[in-house]
């Protein structure tokens, strides 16, 4: 875990890492730039086959955060592959713990595999946990997007907050 040097807001950011480290990193950058979130804690949740990308994602998150003037605590949690019930239970428990500690919780589903995303969202909805944001970086095209967020034309990408979108 990377300890925070600067206390940010009382926000925590849970991000699901699947096949694309770029998707995770770019979604995080978009959330900071477009939504203004400054999480005090970042948790990268991944499945074992994709865990090798997690340290790279953590370093990128740290560098991007520092560029915005803060340093979150970063942790990595690896889960067995395709165990959506276990993934959901772990993410639910993690979110409940963060909320109990006074954090507002945001979840980014952009890079997560469908089974992990489904498990997380089902588990959270069944117990009525109040998640503040569910982020997804929507791309109009997947051509040539494995590069930094600021190098992808903004007209083909849009950070969505599913909680805001469904409340409107």
Residue spans for each PLM region:
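Long, low-complexity, Lys/Arg-enriched
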Residues: 1-104, 115-168
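Short glycine-rich phosphate-binding loop at a beta-alpha junction
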Residues: 104-110
């Amino acid at each position: 875990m990377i300890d925070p040097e600067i206390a940010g807001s009382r926000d925590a950011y849970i991000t699901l890492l699947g096949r694309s480290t770029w998707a995770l990193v770019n979604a995080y950058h978009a959330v900071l730039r477009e939504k203004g979130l400054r999480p005090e804690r970042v948790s990268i949740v991944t499945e074992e086959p994709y865990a090798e990308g997690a340290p790279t994602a953590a370093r990128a998150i740290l560098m991007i955060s520092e560029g915005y003037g803060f340093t979150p605590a970063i942790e990595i949690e690896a889960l067995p592959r395709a165990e959506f019930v276990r993934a959901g239970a772990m993410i639910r428990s993690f979110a409940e713990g963060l909320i109990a500690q006074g954090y507002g919780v945001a979840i980014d589903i952009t890079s997560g595999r469908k089974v992990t995303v489904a498990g997380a969202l089902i588990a959270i909805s069944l117990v009525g946990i109040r998640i503040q944001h569910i982020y997804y970086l929507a791309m109009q095209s997947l051509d040539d997007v494995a590069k930094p967020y600021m190098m992808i034309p903004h007209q083909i990408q849009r950070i969505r907050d599913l909680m805001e979108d469904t409340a409107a």
